């Protein structure tokens, strides 16, 4: 499609470090070319938004069974921000986002901060806002982790169940430092190769490849 309806309105992303001593980025700034209300839904009217994403969360949630039948709903506990370091990353991310939106390039655009709101200042106030509004950003992973004591084997087979494989983001032991769509597609393609018995030679990066 063409125009705004033909896109997902997330036009750009930036990767930054919440602390200068980090070896790699741990925070993603997501720029949205639309007015997003608190909670993530699109609002009516002109606007833009900047979302803050912690790329390497240390908090761990859980999914447990609530009964013995397939109709019993699982018990899902995201356990968000159970590790205090995740909160610190998001606080620094909000501060960085505010600095970006106060840059000269945004002068004269007529924007006003809707959330957290300019009245929310200081660590304690930001922490309270984040605790009340944090979410998974639709990227939960790891509920069927591929690891020695995990749900699936290196061939994506569910341990203890014949003929069943899992090929989605749930097999990732930890989340990728970015959106999960592309690696999830790769997992599906790899699963198809495993089922077909097709083996490809491992890709080797060029010797002169530079990494960030």
Regions inferred by a protein language model and the residue ranges of each:
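FAD-dependent oxidoreductase catalytic-site/capping-region signature
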Residues: 2-183, 191-212
